[in-house]
Regions:
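Surface-exposed loop/turn motifs in large extracellular/passenger domains
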Residues: 33-62, 66-326, 331-349, 355-368, ...
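Bacterial Sec-dependent N-terminal signal peptides
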Residues: 1-17
Length: 383
């Protein structure tokens, strides 16, 4: 039988072709199985884990180092950066639990967007009927030595906002937009010794969660409470001006654990700027704090804040969802709350006795308002 001879050149070409094919296949597998944090647009082909396990992929920001599962950040003079993430029906886990092993220089964020950044996450862009879920968990380290900011770390589920706004730049240029078309679950957040929040917004931010936002009971905690007013835990936190948060529905039930300082909290600007135009909209769901706890509120709002729970966009009519609420509402002058109790809805609680702001309650047939709230008394501005 005659055998075909293969030249050395042909052999080299064949070997090179096989090597290229193998490398191409290997690269594809690595892309599918990547556990690196996300900082660019991406389409999933399988369930995705974004994990911080070392000090790579954590760029220095202006004030502290950041570890984030999804990070949107550009320098002040850069153009707006857009990150589009299509989960394509797969689940996304943002695991920042190993940040605690990196030392006291790092705070942890599931999703962090600031400085001219737009982030859009779609659960399934082409087939909305097949949806995935985003799960967030994070831990940071506390150090008993020193008093510098680097010694006191924080953990946040979702943090949005433009820190440059403190220098009074234009809102239109600085607005940080984050849209999440998926359900989000906060599984665990353990901060070092300063604010730990499920959601945090700071100046010129627009966050929309078009899905269900859940904080599991007892998920938020601190390792060490040692900085007075700065040692706080919040479900949703706002500070500064021009912040908008919209959530289709929420499930935050802290009625048994009592681990939250306040479920919803807003503060005035820390830098002497205006505190105004802050809006929170929640379509319905469960929002509960542990009753009979001194100075722990369902809502604790500084001036310039409006919140809408199960009401329409302008607060003129009741919504169509159910709301299960528990806790006291405290509002400073210049702030307003709009609460809608449809059939099957319930609010156990009331307002702080010396409330300065306004609470507008919509109570339809079948809704229930129970004011047995530790004797604090209630004053509803409009009923």
């Amino acid at each position: 039988m005659k055998r075909n001879k293969v030249s050395k050149l042909q052999m080299r070409r064949l070997a090179a072709g096989v090597t290229i094919a193998l490398l191409a296949g290997t690269c594809q597998v690595m892309a599918d199985q990547s556990t690196n944090p996300i900082s660019e647009s991406e389409v999933f082909t399988a369930d995705r884990l974004a994990q911080v396990v070392n000090k790579n992929n954590m760029p220095k920001e202006r004030f502290k180092s950041v570890a984030a599962g999804i990070l949107g950040y550009t320098h002040d003079k850069a153009s707006i950066k857009t990150i589009n993430i299509d989960m394509a029906g797969h689940d996304l886990t943002l695991d920042l639990t190993k940040v605690a092993d990196l030392g006291t220089d790092y705070s942890a964020y599931g999703i962090k967007a600031n400085n001219k950044t737009t982030i859009v996450v779609d659960s399934n862009k082409t087939n909305p009927g097949k949806n995935g879920t985003i799960t967030i968990k994070a831990k940071t380290l506390w150090s008993p030595s020193g008093d510098s900011g680097s010694k006191y770390t924080a953990a946040h589920g979702i943090a949005v906002g433009n820190f440059s706004q403190r220098f009074n730049k234009k809102v239109s240029e600085d607005l940080v937009k984050t849209t999440i078309n998926a359900d989000v679950v906060i599984e665990e957040l353990r901060g070092g010794s300063i604010k730990t929040t499920g959601i945090s917004s700071m100046d010129c931010s627009d966050l929309a969660i078009n899905g269900r936002f859940t904080i599991k009971p007892g998920a938020i905690s601190l390792m060490q409470w040692n900085r007075g007013d700065q040692s706080k835990t919040y479900g949703i936190y706002m500070i500064g001006s021009n912040n908008t948060i919209s959530i289709t529905s929420a499930d935050i039930d802290d009625s048994k654990h009592g681990s939250l300082s306040d479920l919803i909290k807003t503060d005035e600007s820390l830098w002497g700027g205006k505190t105004e135009k802050n809006v929170l909209r929640i379509g319905g769901g469960t929002l509960k704090v542990k009753e009979n706890q001194k100075e722990r509120y369902l809502i604790s709002a500084a001036k310039g804040f409006r919140t809408f729970i199960n009401v329409n966009q302008d607060g003129s009519a009741i919504g169509i969802s159910k709301a299960d609420l528990q806790g006291t509402i405290r509002m400073d002058a210049g702030s307003e709350a709009y609460v809608g109790l449809t059939a099957g809805s319930k609010w156990v609680g009331g307002t702080q006795a010396d409330i300065k702001g306004k609470v507008n309650l919509f109570l339809s047939e079948g809704g229930e308002w129970n004011t047995l709230n530790a004797g604090q008394g209630s004053r509803v501005t409009r009923f």
